[in-house]
Amino acid sequence: MKHSVLAGLFATGALAQGGAWQQCGGVGFSGSTSCVSGYTCVYLNDWYSQCQPQPTTLRTTTTPGATSTTRSAPAATSTTPAKGKFKWFGINQSCAEFGKGEYPGLWGKHFTFPSTSSIQTHINDGFNMFRVAFSMERLAPNQLNAAFDANYLRNLTETVNFITGKGKYAMLDPHNFGRYYERIITDKAAFASFFTKLATHFASNPLVVFDTNNEYHDMDQQLVFDLNQAAIDAIRAAGATSQYIMVEGNSWTGAWTWNVTNNNLAALRDPENKLVYQMHQYLDSDGSGTSTACVSTQVGLQRVIGATNWLRQNGKVGLLGEFAGGANSVCQQAIEGMLTHLQENSDVWTGALWWAGGPWWGDYIYSFEPPSGIGYTYYNSLLKKYVP
């Protein structure tokens, strides 16, 4: 989820030119449609164009507000779907990463940890994976390769152990957007050191899943590849060989742009062959997940078909690690269509996770926190249809 980072991204829209990898077009976009020198505005879909390096083989926009010049339509259906059940279906747990910029912050004031009673409620309903967001700055204060903070690690471990002690999967989500103290992570050795310590701590728990980072964005594409590979290598070298690893892509790891933005990630290698490509998808006009309005009843299906084809063509499997929609009939139909498509293609889609639960979400438009979260009260009965 973009959180306040999204606001910062849109705030740059009034600049004269879009920076490297930033948005430069799309329905409802009001920022600059030109890019800095060496980059060109590339059409990805009707809602999102991005400043990408030249030369490029992708189709580009020509004038501000214009549609792309030679855009081909996405495939209407994927090939050879395989119906079945999901391996994982669950809920994001978001609260330990709250209090952005308040580091280390105070537990109970700036951040908290998930409610085990709420997680138990979800487990009782059949959900079997929980993606636990946390802050790298709190776990490794001041330096990315620093020793872990004992108190924060203990609280994180207690949450993980509660989930896995019930026989369910706990995904460790460094919710940092490829950044550390607001700066893009470029020190691959320090990044690897972080994952060496994290994997060493959890290596004996086979129900732990490692996520390399939440929603890389506006970054050099090769750097995104290198950070993912560094995390994979560090996790395996630390002895965590039985666990799955989730890799994420650039452009907020969006499913709707994956096949044209993150194609190089197909070359990632895991000696244990347990990589899962995690994508996120929201259904509002700009895909940001900040509105209760969905574009149409078909938008969910439309936005994941390209990713389905990419996974199958490259022999990969994926997880929709974040999705949500407003509490209304249009979004409900869009979500149901999207989830049904993923389930019908369960040879390449391992599952999906709603964004988000957590005790501090209050009246947030997608809150899945029992008993009264808006998303929970509106969507729980629907989502239970898809649990493994």
Curated annotation (Swiss-Prot):
Q: Which domain of life is it from?
A: Eukaryota
Q: Which GO terms describe its cellular component?
A: extracellular region
Protein name as annotated: Endoglucanase 3
GO BP annotations, alphabetical order: cellulose catabolic process
Per the Swiss-Prot or TrEMBL record, the active site comprises: 215 (proton donor), 322 (nucleophile)
Q: Which organism is it from?
A: Humicola insolens
Q: Which portions of the sequence form the region Disordered?
A: 56-81
Q: What is the lineage of its organism?
A: Eukaryota, Fungi, Dikarya, Ascomycota, Pezizomycotina
Under catalytic activity, the entry for this protein gives:
Endohydrolysis of (1->4)-beta-D-glucosidic linkages in cellulose, lichenin and cereal beta-D-glucans
The glycosylation sites are: 92, 155, 259
